[in-house]
Design a protein with these regions (language model features):
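Active-site cofactor/cluster-binding pocket
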Residues: 106
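Catalytic nucleophile serine of serine hydrolases
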Residues: 109-112
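Extended, subdomain-level signal for the structured scaffold at the beginning of enzyme domains
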Residues: 1-103
Length: 112
């Protein structure tokens, strides 16, 4: 059975970590979809490179059953999370992580 992974990318994201995940999934035939933890699909890496994610985290809510695992790709947005915790996309982030956890799904991530 094919596996499918939801990849969360904060804004800004650690591009090195994100691309290591994506390359590993690609090379191993694992399907994935990248969700920006943002109001828009357009995000940046810590070094300022612009990226376009597949979708935004708000659209992952309610679709957790379509994925076997959740991968969290950290970045410079995390150290200032407390200042932005009330933003809708960060509220969605916490809800999605909780839902994946409640369903006993695999969750991994990194912070660098």
């Amino acid at each position: 059975m094919a596996k499918k992974v939801a990849v969360l990318a904060v804004n800004p994201v650690n591009g090195c970590g994100l691309f290591q995940y994506l390359e590993a999934f690609f090379e191993n035939g694992i399907s994935y979809k990248v969700f920006a933890v943002s109001d828009t699909k357009e995000i940046k890496t810590n070094s300022g490179i612009s990226l376009t994610a597949d979708d935004v985290i708000a659209n992952l809510k309610g679709h957790e059953d379509e994925f076997d695992a959740l991968v969290f790709s950290c970045g410079d947005a995390v150290p200032v999370f407390q200042q932005n915790a009330d933003k809708p996309y960060n509220v969605d982030l916490m809800q999605v992580i909780k839902t994946f956890g409640d369903k006993g799904k695999i969750m991994i991530g990194h912070c660098a």
